[in-house]
Amino acid sequence: MKHYLITGGTGMIGSQLVKAIIQSDAHITILTRQDMTSSHPKISYVNWSQPNWENEIPDIDIVINLAGASLNKRWTKSYKQTIMLSRIQATQALFELFQNRKHKPEVLFNASAVGYYKPDLYRTYTELYKTLPFDFLSEVVYQWERMARQFETLGTRVVIGRFGMVLSNDGGALPMMKLPYDFYLGGKLGSGRQWYSWIHIDDLVRALLHTINTESARGVFNFTAPIVEHQNMFGYTLARVSHRPHHTWVPSLAIRLALGQMSTVVLDTQKVIPNKLQATHFKFKYPDLKIALEDLVH
């Protein structure tokens, strides 16, 4: 019976992941920042903001590191530090935990983001592309992945998932994107030509477990649907599924003034495809945006 250790296990992605894992013959320990009790016999919580939390962790086979402050807040100077440190410090704490243990994890799955890649209207990015940090978000991703790769020195297989925009009803981008359409105000953002590399949350959870269970899977994987859309087409598809018009336009300048540096998530984007996932014979349930939105939008 495998024992999973999950950070970020109470968040949008982590909650769905826990539901999927617990259907198999597995135990789960979830690291949290507050005291929690479990009603499930195979799920336990450890508050790792308390002293000596390490003593409560049993032998672990698989580590899934999803910890990190949300990007969906205004990026003030202090909050940017929170975004960075919440990821770096959590990953370092995990490494130090297992560095001092005889029983090492077989696999580490570490979350990351497509913000690693430079914004480009014309380039299609695969996992083969390598670059150095060029803005705040890419610096966060670069440092986070660097910390995760330390686990390779323990003999642990490391899988890094660069997540695209995760579509879910329970949080993330979709509820915020749908809100203007609910009020008949949806439309083009900026040029509308920027790419939205997205993935349905069910496919993300399935792909994550697929890479964990595929022994040949290691290194970086792009967690995006194979069919990427421009923002204008994304919005048009969302409008059709929502039975609302797609007719307004918000200039780039207005978005940058309203969101500050966080506007890069909306305007400065990349076309990212999941070559390595598909090479491992992973089959998407929602490869097409319309199918994904029809499942999520009610």
Swiss-Prot record:
Q: Which domain of life is it from?
A: Bacteria
- The SS bond pairs are none
NCBIfam families registered for this protein in UniProt: yfcH
What the record says about family reads: Belongs to the NAD(P)-dependent epimerase/dehydratase family. SDR39U1 subfamily.
What's the protein called, per UniProt? Epimerase family protein SSP1921
Question: What does the organism's lineage look like at the top?
Answer: Bacteria, Bacillati, Bacillota, Bacilli, Bacillales
